[in-house]
């Protein structure tokens, strides 16, 4: 695809950035992220309304990640010759449809169908977002355009959980998803208005992505990515029942905790470049080790609200290093195939999200309240050990 983008640049002779299109892509990414994480803050009322356990309701996160995993791997190959403008419009339609299906769901099955639609849009859009952005601006402006995209992601991660918790208490969880559907409609119209025609990739340029896994250290890196994100979702998906039952937070208190977590994540993302300049490998090993210790502290002393709040802030600050760190690892260690490596990374992350949420939900329902924390801490510790022992890092 990178060669195709280069050729396309030459043919189209992009001389000025299309900022309206860039911001429309950023807005769509932000909406997808917000809707992906809404169930985290609405898990309890959703479960009560549908007559299911919180662990089962958490599988609405699982199915989204599961479908997104396959979408990220295969959708760009399936739609090679299709104009990307129409594909992005389709993703925005799927986002809107997902929100409406969830808001009107009267059964767990319909809820899962709605969340599967979101997974298709999420995985496909994430797999294409960077290459889309690169085709909307001149080469010299690509870093700035990408910063807009990832800035939107950071903002979405900050506001998604606390906004969902606050609005859920105010207007009910179904109306929260109705409001998200309205955002989806805005996405559709903005994309139609601003996104130009973007021809698809010629079929003769199709290459085997999975051969990258045969390179030294790459498989170990992908396993480490899997364990770190599975550990994150095993904990974060069930943060509401854990914090409300273990630490005794009410809805208002939980909203503040989630807001603190989101702000800490934003700060961590902002500071990550300074930390990664010193040592990427140290950051990739040190961050999950700190998270493993945090999970242990929360398991032992999480009934204290101050301790629980402190752990949430430390978790947000520390985990923010992990996605940025692994992206940096790809650009350094797999620079010649960064786009394909990024596609595998997205799929691995979505698979990890699926497994983490699924196993965490099973543990919550069948083992106990702190079991998702113990699972998360164990995975984070294993990640730190694997990175230290096996992951290779090329110097910049």
Curated annotation (Swiss-Prot):
GO terms for cellular component: plasma membrane. Residues 1-21, 76-85, 129-147, 197-215, 277-281, 327-343, 388-396 are cytoplasmic. It catalyses: inosine(in) + H(+)(out) = inosine(out) + H(+)(in); guanosine(in) + H(+)(out) = guanosine(out) + H(+)(in). InterPro entries: MFS (IPR011701), MFS_dom (IPR020846), MFS_Efflux_Transporters (IPR050189), MFS_NepI (IPR023680), MFS_trans_sf (IPR036259). It is a multi-pass membrane protein. It comes from the Bacteria. Keywords: Antiport, Cell inner membrane, Cell membrane, Membrane, Transmembrane, Transmembrane helix, Transport. The chain crosses the membrane at residues 22-42, 55-75, 86-106, 108-128, 148-168, 176-196, 216-236, 256-276, 282-302, 306-326, 344-364, 367-387. Residues 43-54, 107, 169-175, 237-255, 303-305, 365-366 are periplasmic. GO terms for molecular function: antiporter activity; purine nucleoside transmembrane transporter activity. It is found in: Cell inner membrane. Its main location: membrane. Involved in the efflux of purine ribonucleosides, such as inosine and guanosine. Belongs to the major facilitator superfamily. DHA1 family. NepI (TC 2.A.1.2.26) subfamily. This is Purine ribonucleoside efflux pump NepI. It comes from Escherichia coli O1:K1 / APEC. The gene is nepI.
């Amino acid at each position: 695809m990178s060669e195709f983008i280069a050729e396309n640049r030459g043919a189209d002779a992009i001389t000025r950035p299309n900022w309206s299109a860039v911001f429309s892509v950023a807005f769509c990414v932000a909406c997808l992220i917000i809707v992906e994480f809404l169930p985290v803050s609405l898990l309890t009322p959703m479960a009560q309304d549908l007559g299911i356990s919180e662990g089962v309701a958490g599988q609405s996160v699982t199915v989204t990640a599961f479908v997104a995993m396959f979408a990220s791997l295969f959708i760009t190959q399936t739609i090679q010759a299709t104009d990307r403008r129409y594909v992005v419009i389709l993703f925005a339609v799927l986002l809107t449809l997902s929100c409406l299906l969830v808001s009107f769901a009267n059964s767990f099955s319909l809820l899962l169908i709605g969340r599967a639609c979101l997974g298709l849009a999420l995985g496909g859009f994430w797999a294409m977002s960077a290459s889309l952005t690169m085709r909307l601006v001149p080469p010299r402006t690509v870093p700035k355009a990408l910063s807009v995209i990832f800035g939107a992601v950071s903002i979405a991660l900050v506001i998604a959980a606390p906004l969902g918790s606050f609005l859920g208490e105010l207007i009910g969880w179904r109306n929260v998803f109705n409001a998200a559907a309205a955002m989806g409609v805005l996405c559709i119209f903005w994309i139609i208005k601003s996104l130009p025609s973007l021809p698809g990739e010629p079929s003769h340029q199709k290459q085997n992505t999975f051969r990258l896994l045969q390179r030294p250290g790459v498989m170990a890196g992908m396993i480490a990515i899997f364990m770190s994100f599975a550990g994150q979702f095993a904990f974060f998906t069930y943060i509401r029942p854990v914090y409300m039952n273990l630490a005794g937070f009410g809805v208002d208190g939980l909203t503040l905790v989630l807001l603190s977590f989101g702000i800490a994540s934003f700060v961590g993302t902002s500071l990550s470049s300074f930390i990664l300049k010193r040592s990427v490998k140290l950051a990739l090993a040190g961050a999950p080790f700190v998270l493993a210790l945090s999970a242990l502290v929360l398991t032992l002393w999480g009934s204290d609200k101050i301790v629980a709040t402190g752990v949430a802030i430390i978790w947000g600050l520390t985990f923010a290093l992990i996605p940025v760190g692994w992206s940096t690892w790809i650009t350094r260690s797999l620079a010649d195939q960064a786009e394909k490596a990024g596609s595998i990374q997205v799929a691995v992350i979505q698979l990890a999200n699926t497994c983490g949420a699924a196993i965490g939900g099973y543990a919550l329902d069948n083992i106990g309240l702190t079991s998702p924390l113990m699972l998360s801490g164990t995975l984070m510790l294993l990640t730190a050990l694997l990175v230290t022992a096996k992951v290779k890092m090329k110097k910049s």
